[in-house]
Amino acid sequence: VPVREVATGIAATATFAALVVAAVRRSEGVDGFPLGIDLVAPALGTVGLVAAGLDAGGPPALAVIRTLIGAAFLGAVSDAMLLGHWYLVQPGLPRGPLLELVRWTGRLWPFELAALLWPTGMVSVLAGTVDDGYGGLLGWFWLACTVASIALVAATRAALRERQYSAVMSATGLLYLAILTAFGMDLVARACLA
């Protein structure tokens, strides 16, 4: 899809430009940093995601919604795990940003679930009206990933309530598992419904 590829290329260029600006202005601190520059790449990326959703097939609005929510959900859980690694090497950092990403993952989960259940969705796979090619096994695997994803988010939030440094290590490990189950939730559904 040409629009998707062009938007991706421009978004990558905008991301690199924001990195260069941040590196050049590093000594000046946060004051005076052009905050709008950080919004250019996500805006262009959204254009690419909409184009990808329209190209995915099926009802256009549902395909776009699934693509946008899926990108936000998988982005939140991936960013949370990556930020968790930063906390492992910088233990004195405040936990607020990590907790915020974990909260966003939990907030996005019901929307991801609803988008994947919306007909024709995973309910059809679980009911057997859509064949997953494995006698229903992928539908049950998807269900397990879905339940495990929100359970791991809840466990991560509980771990981050603890004050010890080991809590951040535990949270990062739980987020590793949450990435696996979140991708299972999203990608298995896409494979079954393709």
Where does each model-flagged region fall?
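Hydrophobic cores of alpha-helical transmembrane segments in multi-pass integral membrane proteins
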Residues: 1-53, 67-86, 102-126, 135-193
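Helix-coil boundary and interhelical linker segments in multi-pass alpha-helical membrane proteins
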Residues: 53-63, 128-129
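Membrane-helix interfacial "entry" motifs
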Residues: 59-63, 93-96, 134, 138
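Cytosolic, membrane-interface loops and tails of multi-pass inner-membrane proteins
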Residues: 86-98
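Juxtamembrane/interface segments of multi-pass membrane proteins
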Residues: 95, 127-130
